[in-house]
């Protein structure tokens, strides 16, 4: 558990917890769980340059933000943050699956699954992000599929947002025309 559910290959605290769970406790499932309205995600997207030590931690999310900015920039701020949260979950599942701890466990034939979920703080639902890995092969496949799905959803949301803006502009024009007509009468 950390700010923005990050799995960084130099974070010895995170990796030691994972190694103990996998090698000693023989756990079968690991869940990477982000949440909507995440302050870490919002901070990474912000323009504030220096938040102290947390700025270094959030650089990984800023990289993700810049990597997918072409699709995220068209979304409303709320949708943008939630989409980045979902992308981050997929990315962290991938990072964990690429760690030597998990790869060694899979190579030894351990039954170990990594799941990517998002907790929606508005309604309390856990949403499976469709990125679940039980081997190196499934990691690659589900990661690519999850990213493709998120890009598709972002494009749909972007088109919907653009359409809604056009409708709002038309309504405003009609209201202005009606107001002018009322004044003229």
Annotated model-derived regions:
Residues 30-36:
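Ordered, amphipathic secondary-structure segments that act as subunit-interaction surfaces
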Residues 4-28, 39-185:
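Divalent-metal-activated hydrolytic enzyme cores
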């Amino acid at each position: 558990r950390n700010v923005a559910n990050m799995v960084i290959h130099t974070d010895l605290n995170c990796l030691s917890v994972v190694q103990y769970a996998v090698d000693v406790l023989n756990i079968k499932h690991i869940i990477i769980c982000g949440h909507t309205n995440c302050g870490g995600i919002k901070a990474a997207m912000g323009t504030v340059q220096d938040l102290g030590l947390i700025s270094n931690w959030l650089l990984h999310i800023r990289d993700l933000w810049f990597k997918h900015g072409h699709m995220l920039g068209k979304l409303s701020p709320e949708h943008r943050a939630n989409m980045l949260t979902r992308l981050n979950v997929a990315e962290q599942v991938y990072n964990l699956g690429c760690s030597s701890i998990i790869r060694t466990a899979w190579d030894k034939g351990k039954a170990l699954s990594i799941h990517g979920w998002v907790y929606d703080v508005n309604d309390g639902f856990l949403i499976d992000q469709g990125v679940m890995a039980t081997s190196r092969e499934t990691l690659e496949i589900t990661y690519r599929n999850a990213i493709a799905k998120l890009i598709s959803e972002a494009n749909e949301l972007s088109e919907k947002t653009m359409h809604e803006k056009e409708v709002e502009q038309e309504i405003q024009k009609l209201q202005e025309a009606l107001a002018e007509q009322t004044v003229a009468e």
